[in-house]
Regions:
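Flexible "cap/lid" loop of the alpha/beta hydrolase fold
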Residues: 81, 85-86, 90-129, 134
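Catalytic histidine neighborhood in serine/cysteine hydrolases
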Residues: 204-223
Length: 249
């Protein structure tokens, strides 16, 4: 049995991992799904993903786990990699979903800061229509209106101040490739085949940095593969979790 923290995407809810949490628990693993976009997680700290990494470690410690595996999607993946910088010796396994190890380009960072400024001015109402095409794959948008509607609801429910903070933190994040290169516990990379934000080349680069770990490609899914194809992602995560030794590292 592994203790596992599931770290959600931006700007969504921990509920995005409901099916994966059920599948992992059914396989005998203990699962905690921290909320990363709350005042409790952020406090009054300056924007820095290390703050969220500290929060995850504290949540897991409170749950009785000094060592644990971590699976993060998109922003959750960035936080997972920040956790490696903070306390890699406490991480028994790593799953990176629809994320990237590279830092933002100057253009991408500028876009994040402009997004944050607009949310600070206008709130979240404009965000779903402006971002849903990037977040969800073409197949999901065309055939799964219930998924589109659920993602819209999660976005609109997000705390705008936390969203601003998180975008600023992600814009400033460092490259994490070197952190992956020294991590040699059970790892997997998962990517939606229709993900345009963190596409397959980014996934392959992370897998190579991790020493050639498996890459699970999820068909007909975009950036939010865990929501778009929950059963396929659940199977990939259970297969990974089953490789983690109890009590490791």
């Amino acid at each position: 049995m592994a203790a596992i923290a599931l770290l959600h995407a931006f700007p969504l809810s921990p509920a995005m991992f409901d099916e994966q949490a059920r599948a992992l628990r059914a396989a005998g693993h203990e699962v905690v799904v921290p909320d990363l976009l709350t005042a409790t997680a952020i406090g009054d700290a300056q924007p820095d993903l290390g703050v969220l990494a500290h929060h995850v470690r504290a949540v897991m410690s409170d749950a009785g786990h000094s060592t644990f595996a971590v699976a993060g999607l998109s922003m959750g993946g960035y936080v997972a990699m920040a956790l490696l910088r903070l306390a890699a010796h406490h991480v028994s396994g790593l799953a990176l979903l629809d994320t990237k190890a590279t830092a933002d380009s100057e253009v991408a960072a500028k876009g994040r800061l402009e997004y944050a400024e607009r949310v600070a001015r206008e709130g979240m109402d404009w965000v779903p229509s402006a971002t849903i095409e990037a977040l969800l794959g073409e197949t999901t948008r065309a055939t799964k209106p219930e998924v589109v509607a659920q993602v819209d609801r999660w976005i609109l429910a997000a705390d705008s101040a936390a969203v601003v903070w998180a975008q600023q933190a992600m814009a400033a994040r460092p490259d994490s490739t070197a952190d992956l290169a020294v991590f040699r516990r059970p790892a997997v990379v998962i990517v939606g085949q229709e993900d345009t934000l963190s596409p397959l080349p980014e996934a392959l680069a992370m897998a190579a940095a991790l020493g050639g770990v498996p890459v699970a490609e999820i068909p007909t899914s975009g950036h939010l593969s865990a929501v778009e194809s929950p059963s396929a992602v659940s199977r990939a995560l259970v297969a990974w979790a089953d490789r983690i030794s109890p009590g490791a590292p």
